[in-house]
Amino acid sequence: MPIKRGEIYLFIGFGAEKFSPKMLSKKDRRKLKKYPNLANQNSFKLSRYLKFRAKKRGKICLSHKENIAVLAISKEKVGVDVEELKERNFDGVIKFCFSKKESEIYASAKDKMQKFYEIYTAKEAVIKAKNLAFSNLANVKFDEMERRYLIINNLFIICLAFKHCKDIIVKFL
């Protein structure tokens, strides 16, 4: 079924055991030749498995961590980011990439960890949707695009950033 305008397909995968090198695109095979250590990385295998299984045409955006990968596909520009929800020292990241307003929102939040990840994943998703470099993180506002969050088992947060969306279709693979 083709993707319609206003739809975002979000594919989520947790296990790389179904991955096979036969699933790789020509581009990914060249990448693997250049960086052979990628073959040992769970996040690489998992994200490539999602790309293979999705088989949808449109604009794609990919994000992955060690034990999860997410792939967003849409007719319009879309950005996605996934992060593991875990305590860490957020101060350095906040100083580097949060605006004054974002820092104030974080500081006044009841659940600081969740608020940090909501802002941070939104900024990364916006960067991806706008095809900007990571160095632009400080200049991007977390609320400059529409966004939706998905928290999975209190372990991961996923943020989608987009301009127009009527439906989000989530598939766990």
State where each predicted segment sits.
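Core catalytic alpha/beta fold that binds nucleotide/phospho-ligands
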Residues: M1-L173
